[in-house]
Structure formats: C-alpha cells, structure tokens
C-alpha cells in the first residue's frame, strides 16, 4: 500500500536472465498475451512501473503496478505511486543515481562518503558522550518521518528501537513539525481523532468540503475513485483555498459550476472562517442536540490531564462563546463575501426539506494541520 491514501499495488520481481511467455501458463498474469487485450486491461504496466534493481545481491526485473482489486484505487495509479519502480535507484537503467548508497559525514567543512562502520561508530560515540556528560534527555534527534516508497525513519526499525525503545529519547523533531507531536492536536482535544472516516463517505455525502487540499493532484486516486462518484451522486463541493487549483475546475466539470463554491480566503484565515461558520450554524440551530449533549460536558469543568494535555473545552455553550465570530467579522478577516459564507454554512448543515440532516464530509490539510493559524 502506498502513502496515507493506502492505494494497493502488486510488486513482481524475477531474474534478469529469465523470460516468460505469451501463453497463460507462462506469465505472472495468467492471461493469453498473444490475444488483443481490452482497453482497461490490468495485465499492462507503464514504463514508469518497471525497472531493473538489485535484490539479494543480484539484478532483477521489478514491476510495481496498481491492484485492480483494491477498493481504494481500483487499479488507478497516481503520478507518484505509479512511478515507484522508476524511482528506485538502478545502475542498469540509470534511474535515481543521486540516491545515497553509503553514509555521509560532515568532515572538514563538507559532506564526505564514509563506511557504515565509521558512521555507526561516530553516532554511538557522540550519543554515549552526551549520556556520560549529562543525561539521555540532552540528546536531540532530527529526522524525516513517513515510510512511503523510499523508506522512512519509522521503517528503520533498529534506529527507532534504539532511540525510542531503549534510550527513550524525549526530544525529537521531524520534517514538518518542531516535535514528534500530532498534526491535529486541536481536533483531538475536541474528541475528534483524525482519519476517522471511510472513503465511501465521499460517495454518500450531500456536501464535500475540501480545506487547504488539492486532491486531484495530491490525492489523485482518492479524488477520482471516491470523490468524483460522490459528485455524480449529487454532492455539492466547497473548496477553501487561496488559490484556484485544477481541483476546482474538475469539480465544476463533474458536479456543475452551480454546485461548486470556491472560498478563496486570505492566507492564514482558516480558523476565522471556521469560527464564523460555527457561529452561524449554531445560531440557526442546525445542530444535533442529542449528540452534543452526549459528547460534551454539561456544567462540569474540564480538567487538564497534564502539562502536555490541556483541558478540553467545557460545554457547547462555552465553545460558542469562545469561538463566536459574526458574519461581518469573518468576512472582513477572510476577505470573503458574507453571502458566500452563508451559502457554505447552508451546504454544510442546513436540514433538507424533509427535515433530515445533511451529510457533509470534510477533508482538511494545509492552513489547519500544517499552519500556525
């Protein structure tokens, strides 16, 4: 599975000096390749899905192709995931020659290649020196996170076991954060864990809200395989982004321009928009009162767990008071028209004519989890 979207892929390797055949019993696909294949065949792979790499010290053919049976991508390949094979280092095909094959150490004012033994010895000596001189907590680790195609810190099992399991290092930063903390700490404080929805939600939604994300380009398979069917089922789309991206155009093509609302907010005003929407929706009474009553404090005061886990908001009314922002204030801060904010609120929460609640699926990223707004 590739990246956080989780698209399925099949990986095949076989020796460079071994060939299959066109008959069904002589190839991995089990298909008669001597016959014309249909346009949507899953037995074809693009040049970007092929390479020659080293495996167990030997050259092998490598094919990484989309899994047509995976419910996430249904055989679709994005511009990133469909190039996993091409993005492997290969001395035979010449791909990714800039990838390191040995450690680098900063010596004499420049990065220089060194042996694994030298690199491991250096790390061990520096780490031991810090511990002997002071304390384990004086050791700071800076790293990039995530696994994905090229491997990541979480995949370097030995390193993780050393620093987190054995030494229990407390001080760590990763590629997009000053600490190894949550990207969505505020929503967790409100009882909403991230990644808590199914992709099927997009196909069932009355409204799809996209905040600081450009899914056609950045979550291609999720957009094409799940969001587009939702639009074809009648979903309206709200896009919160200072820019007009290709996603906005694609949504207008699929859902109709009249069913797409692009809120081109001023950069860094995401929370002001959400507070305004919250204030307006709550003021209209478009809330699930039973859910709110069962999920919030009713008169009691929230207590902090510790310094790292501050107290959550108390009652729903307290949240309304703390986050209150009028349409006029929100429009002035975000640069949006009041009418567009009202339209967004209606698309998100206004009950249908029969009184049933609207189903809104919200995907958010830049400006909220990767911003300091």
Question: Where are each of the predicted segments found?
Answer:
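N-terminal export/assembly segments and adjacent metallocofactor-ligating motifs
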Residues: 1-284
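Acidic/polar loop patches that form or flank catalytic/metal-binding clefts of enzymes
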Residues: 20-22, 171-172, 286-290, 340-342, ...
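Long, well-ordered, tryptophan-enriched scaffold segments
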Residues: 122, 238, 245-355
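Conserved short loop/turn motifs at secondary-structure junctions
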Residues: 140-151, 329-336, 364-372
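A glycine-rich, hydrophobic/aromatic-adjacent loop/helix-cap motif
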Residues: 142, 344, 348-373
């Amino acid at each position: 599975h590739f990246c956080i979207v989780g698209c399925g892929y099949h990986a095949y390797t076989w020796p460079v000096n071994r060939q299959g055949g066109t008959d069904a019993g002589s190839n991995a696909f089990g298909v008669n390749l001597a016959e014309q294949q249909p346009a949507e065949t899953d037995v074809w792979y693009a040049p970007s899905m092929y390479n020659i790499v080293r495996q167990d010290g030997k050259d092998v053919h490598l094919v990484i192709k989309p899994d047509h049976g995976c419910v996430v991508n249904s055989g679709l390949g994005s511009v990133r995931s469909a190039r996993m094979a091409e993005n492997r280092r290969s001395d035979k095909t010449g791909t990714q020659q800039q990838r390191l094959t040995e450690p680098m150490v900063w010596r004499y004012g420049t990065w220089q290649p060194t042996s694994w033994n030298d690199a491991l010895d250096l790390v061990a000596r520096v780490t031991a020196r810090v511990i002997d001189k002071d304390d384990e907590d004086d050791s700071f680790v800076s790293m990039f996170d995530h696994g994905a195609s090229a491997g990541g810190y979480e995949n370097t099992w030995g390193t993780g076991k050393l620093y987190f399991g054995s030494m229990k290092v407390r001080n760590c930063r990763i590629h997009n954060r000053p600490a190894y903390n949550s990207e969505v700490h505020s929503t967790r404080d409100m009882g909403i864990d991230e990644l808590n929805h199914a992709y099927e939600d997009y196909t069932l939604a009355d409204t799809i809200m996209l905040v600081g994300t450009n899914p056609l380009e950045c979550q291609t398979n999720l957009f094409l395989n799940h969001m587009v069917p939702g639009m074809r089922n009648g979903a309206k789309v709200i896009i919160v982004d200072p820019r007009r991206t290709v996603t906005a155009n694609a949504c207008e093509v699929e859902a109709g321009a009249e069913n797409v609302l692009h809120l081109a907010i001023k950069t860094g005003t995401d929370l002001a928009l959400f507070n305004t929407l919250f204030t307006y929706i709550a003021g209209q009474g478009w809330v699930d009162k039973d859910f709110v009553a069962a999920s919030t404090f009713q008169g009691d005061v929230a207590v902090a767990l510790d310094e790292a886990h501050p107290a959550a908001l108390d009652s729903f009314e307290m949240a309304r008071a703390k986050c209150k922002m009028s349409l006029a204030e929100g429009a002035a801060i975000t640069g949006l028209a009041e009418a567009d904010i009202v339209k967004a609120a209606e698309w998100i929460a206004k009950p249908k004519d029969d009184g049933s609640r609207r189903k809104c699926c919200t995907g958010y990223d830049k400006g909220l989890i990767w911003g300091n707004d």
